[in-house]
Amino acid sequence: MEAPRRLTLALCVACGLGLALTSARAAEDLTPVLSLTPGQVLRLAGPQLGLSTQYPWLVRTPPPGLLVSAPPGHLELTAREALPWRVVETNHGALLVRTRDGVPVKLAWQGEPGQAVSAAGNFNDWNGASHPLTEVAPGRYQLDLLAAPGELIYLLKVGERYLRDPANPDSIPNGFGSWNSRRVLQDEGGAPPRLRRLGWTRQGEGRVVSFLAEGLGADWSWAGLHGNQALAETAVSRAGDTLRVRLGAGPTLGPDRLRFAVSRGTRRSTLQTVFLDSAFVWQDAVVYALMPDRFRNGDPANDAPVRHPDLLGPANWQGGDLAGILACLDEGYFRRLGVNALWIYPLNESTDQAWQEYPEPHRWYTGYHGYWPVHPTRIEPRFGDSLLFRQVVDRAHAQDMRVLLDLVANHVHQEHPWVTEHPDWFGSLLLPDGRRNLRIWDEQRLTTWFEPYMPDIDYGAHPEAVDAMCEVALKWVDGYGLDGFRHDAVKHVPRELWEGLTRWMKAGVPDKPFYQIGETFGSDELIQSYVGPDALDAQFNFNLFHPAREVFLDSTRSFEELARILELNLANYGANSLMGNLMDSHDKARWPSLAEGDLPLSGANGQEIGWTKPPENDDPRTYDKTRLFLTWLLGLPGVPFLYYGDEIALAGAEDPDNRRMMRFGAQLSELERRQLELTAELVRVRRTRPELRRGDLEIVHAGHDVLVFLRSAEDEQGRPSRSLVALNKSGRPQRAELRLPLGLGSRTLELKPWEGRILPL
């Protein structure tokens, strides 16, 4: 067994890395888990590590196989080869390090000599230029790459055409009415070791945390941090398959949490995070997302729909407002549902006109959704005023609810004062080659415009624009007591803005767990690149959201496939990340309408169906299928988000049909009322079971139609707390014979058609 080595080497890191973390806030931040690609240098600045920038740094001698250097202002790490879990110690805190797993892949194309051929996919964020195929013989092209285990989704770009791989018959819908090629990549290195939690006991001022370890063998090692401090070499003992970790009193660096993992050779367990205090963390949240204009009309006096001959009702203002949200708070709607956080869509004053959408068929829309701001801090009069919003936040806080606000930072509407006051802050709509830089999502990721009337802010070239947006954000926080932000279009904004914003928030609100979650569609690597102590806390887990929807609703797809994706997701993000999980969103067709069969899973024609034949819930089984997916959602690690209407299985095709007015009380059918009650019960179970909020996840059964996983954690006294989440996606009764770990024995589960159950053990 190998424990971390502890010789000390002094490495000096220069000052001047920007605003240092305040000591109060720094004590709450965990250092990031670093993933290294063997042979490549990972260069990080002090704030990216969540460590103090005070001079000097003392870095202990790196573990075997890892090179560490400290050029001015940075830390550089290089893995010579695949590594087990490692710890890198500094005098300001310690870091957990691992290497990325990869599977060799060969892509080929047979065509004409002299063609421009490349590959684009989830491995390179759909960049059609970064991975060219080499012409190895006349007309024969080849690319060798190392891809992450799991699903490889890709297309071949030949000239200007994106084509499926003719050598690969496996394909998957792309969500826009077409198809991508797919390969499922298996890691052939053998099963990794597994850690299971056995609880903790008090010992003097400290604790002893116990784990059951399987598959260790003789060549095993461990890595662990208490808060942000490395464990002592003598902290871990082994008796058979039981590991005991002895901790002292709470750490002086970082929160009172144990992060612990084991390795067998270079095969690594998932990282376990044991929460040793019960103070609120965002893993405890169930967030309710609402679009003010489409939620509830509490004050008809401020209704002001736009008049335009070509503007249709679903694209116009509907009358929802802050008074409606306040009424729901006063009536106890959110409290009865059980949610403990609200995400309120943007409240900025919006344009008072209708504007034509660039893509065909060029429909007209208003800014009812909030994403066309014409002022940085003024509240849209149709929603209310600053006094009313302050009442909403205060009333939510009085009910022990936190409030997130949607912050629009990527762009503004052309009527925004910054457009005339600071025209140089905005990128050009025209590219050097003469094309309009509109919706070129990947090739022009950081500069593309969403619409010709929505100028894109060029933060990379204008640091003063970064400061201006950070000042705006702090005004919203200081003015209303916000608890966090949801950030729009994160991948289209340079990281400099998110770093600046996080510095401002940590300096401005150091004494509470301020949560920032972003929206990025792309690879796990791209998503993770915006997450860290110096940037966002989390992003939405779209790389689990999309395949889960498809597997649940496609009878030909197996839960075995989803189980592999889930395990890869856990390996990437950990079982105790703050990633946001969804059933629905304002950008996607609603789950009940997919379950009803009114919309194709491929996404083809989803928007037109919303305009020409809006779906409705005609089949009572749609409510069963919706409860099934909500059971999955509320049983997962991370932070669950309910999009308004999920609790009643509200129907809807794609935007704007997925943004219908919410309905309440007597407006609900009997099936909808029953759905509301059962959703509240699922939320209650989530809120009261620590393993669902703070626990690990182990898949104990994955068949074609039945998936069962075990969630395990500890209660406030350290005793094991466990639940099974069992799901049947078929229209037939199913039986699952389970052999449970941890001495929990065997049991037979009987599941009704489309049934999901959470079973405390």
Give each language-model segment a name.
Residues L75-A82, L146-G150, A249-D256:
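Surface-exposed, short loops/turns at beta-strand junctions within beta-sandwich domains
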Residues P63, V97-E151, K157-Q186, H226-G227, ...:
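Aromatic-rich carbohydrate-binding modules that target alpha-glucans
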Residues M401, V472-L474, D478-L582, W632, ...:
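Active-site-proximal helices and loops of the catalytic beta/alpha 8
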Residues A27-W57, G199-W220:
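Solvent-exposed, low-complexity, repeat-rich "mucin-like" stalks and linkers
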Residues V33, R98-P113, I172-W200, F275-D299:
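Low-complexity, Pro/Ser/Thr- and charge-rich linker/hinge segments at domain boundaries
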Residues V700-R739:
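Carbohydrate-binding surface patches
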Residues I153, R747-L761:
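C-terminal beta-strand-rich structural cap/linker in extracellular carbohydrate-active enzymes
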Residues V281, F295-Y480, G500-P510, F514, ...:
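Substrate-binding/active-site clefts of carbohydrate-active enzymes
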